[in-house]
Amino acid sequence: MSKVPLKWAPLLVLLLLAGSVAVGQATWSPPPGRSVPWQGNVGVLHDLPLRSAIHATLYPSGGDDAQAIRGAIAGCPAGKVVMLGPGVFSLGSAVSVTSGVTLRGSGMGITVLRGRRGMAGPFVVGIGDPAFGEERGVPLRGALFKGGDTVTTASPHGWRAGDLVMIDQLNDPKGDPPVTNVGVGTSSWNGRAPDRSLGQLVSLKEVTSTTATLEIPLYWSFVSRLRPAAARIGGVTSGAGIEEITVDNGESGSPAQNDSGGTIVMKGVANCWLHRVEVIGSWQSAVRVIAAYRSTIRSCRIHEGIPALPAGGPQYGPRRAYGIFISPYASANLFENNEIYHLVSPFLIAGAVSGNVIAYNYLPDPYYSDPNWIQVTIGFHGPHPVMNLIEGNYSVGRMAPDNYWGSSSHNTFFRNRNRLPEGKRGAPWNFDLQHHAHYYTLVGNVIGEPGTEEVYQLQGVDLAGEKAVYRLGYHSDGDGSREGNDKGVGATLLRHGNWDSVHGATVWNGTEDRSLPPSLYLAGKPAWWGDAPWPPIGPDRVPMYPPDPGVGRGTPWSLQGG
C-alpha cells in the first residue's frame, strides 16, 4: 500500500471528518497571560522607510575604502542615502552607520564589503554609537501591571520623551515561573546585572519629573518585593539602515569578534534595520543584536562559518558560527523572511529579551562539528526571555529553550514547520523544552516526518536514544535520567492543534476553538510575500507547508528575497 505524502495528509483528514465537524468553530486566540499584542508593535514603526535622496555615491578604489565610506556617512544628512556602486569594497577597519542614514548597495552579491585579513575590532559593519551605555537604575514604585503604560519613579529621573529605558527586576528562582540565571552554568551577562534577567526595553512617549508614559505597554507585571528599576540607555542610534549589500567576513573573522562582537553588530538601536543584506562568514555571531528596540532584520541571507569548509570542522563547534544572536536585552524587534544556513544555530535568544517576533525564516542545513549531533535552530539560551513569538518558520533541527544559563518562559511557537535532519541521532527531539522552561505555548505547528520520530513525548523517564516529537523537563542536552526532571515544564505547557509524525494527525487539547488565525502579528499577507499560499504552514493547510526551495534560493514564500 503506498503512503500519502506528509504535506498532503490534511486533505485526507478533511475528507474523513466531512460532515462530523461543526461549521463555524470558535477561533483560537492566545491566552492574555501568555501573550502580548504583537500586531503593530514590532519592527520599525510604520515599516521600513523608502529613502530616495542620494547624498553620495562611492565606488571601490582598489585600496582601503573604509575611511571614504565613514566620511560619506558622517556628512550625510538625516533621511538620505550613501550609495555604494557595484564591486568589492575593501575594509581595513569597521564602518558604522549613524542615525538617520541609509547605507545602500547595488544588490546582494553585487556590492560587497569585504573585511581585510588582520582587521582589528569586534565587527566589520555596524549600526550604533560608541557612546552607547546604561545609566544607573532608578527605583520604580506603585503598580506595574502587565498591560499598563505608565511607570512612576521613586525620585526624579531626568528622562525625556523619546528616550529608551530598560525596565527590570530581581530574579525570583522560587517563583512561578522560576526566573534564575543558574542552570548548567551561571550567567553574569544576560541583563543589566547578573540577578536582573527579566525585563523590557521601552520608549517613552511623555514624561513628568517622576512618571513616564510608554509607547508599548508593559509585557509583564513587576512586583515591589523584587525591586523593579529602570535605567536610561545613552547613545542610542535611530532611523539607520543597511540595504542591498553583501558583508564578507571570511578573511577578517577573528576571536576579537567574540562575545558582544559579530560580522554585523546592531547595538543601542531604535527603529533601525537590515534589509536584503547578505552576511558571509560568522566567527561567533553573524549578526549580534544588543539593546535593540523596534528594529527589523528582513529578507537577509546569512551563511557559512570561518572558514566555510569543512562542514564538520572546529569552526562549527561550541561558541562558534551562530547566525543572529539577540542578547542581553531587546524588545519589540522583528526578524522576518531571512534565510540562514550552514551555521551552528540560526537564532539564539538570551537575557531580558521580550516581545520580539521571529517569523517566516528559512533555516535549513545546519552545520556542527559533531556530525551526529542535532543542533538548535531557534534556541532560548539564557535567562529570561518572555513573550516572544516564533511564527511560520521552516526549520531543520531542534527547537530548544535550554537550561544552560538559566530560565525562560511565556514564549509562543505558532504555525512552524520543523523536522529533524536525516541520519543523525544525537539530541533527536523536535521540541526540547528543558528544565526551567515554563508556560510555553505551541499551537498549529507541523512537527516531524513519518518514519523518523519513534515516540511522542519523553518526560520523567530514563532515555535510551529515542527520537521524539517532544522532550520535556530534562536538565541539559546530555541529561538522560528521570531523576530531577522538572515536571513544571509539562504541567504549564499549552499544546493545541499541532500535527506530529507519531500520531500522523493533528492533536487538539479538548477545547472547541479549533479554527486557527492566519497569524498572531500580521493583519494579512505582507507586501514582501511571494506566490506561496497564505498562511503557508499549519495542520489546516493543504498542503501543510510549501515546497523546500533548497539552500541559497530564497525562502519558501519569497524566492526572490522579499
Across the structure, where does each feature detected by a protein language model lie?
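Ligand-binding pocket scaffold of soluble enzyme catalytic domains
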Residues: 38, 77, 104, 115-116, ...
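Right-handed parallel beta-helix
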Residues: 100, 238-249, 270-281, 293-307, ...
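A conserved hydrophobic secondary-structure block that centers on an alpha-helix together
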Residues: 165, 172, 269-273, 282-284
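Predominantly extracellular beta-rich ligand-binding scaffolds that present long acidic/polar faces
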Residues: 98-100, 119-120, 398, 402-495
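Short, solvent-exposed linear motifs at loop/edge-of-secondary-structure regions
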Residues: 156-169, 195-203, 236-248, 378-397, ...
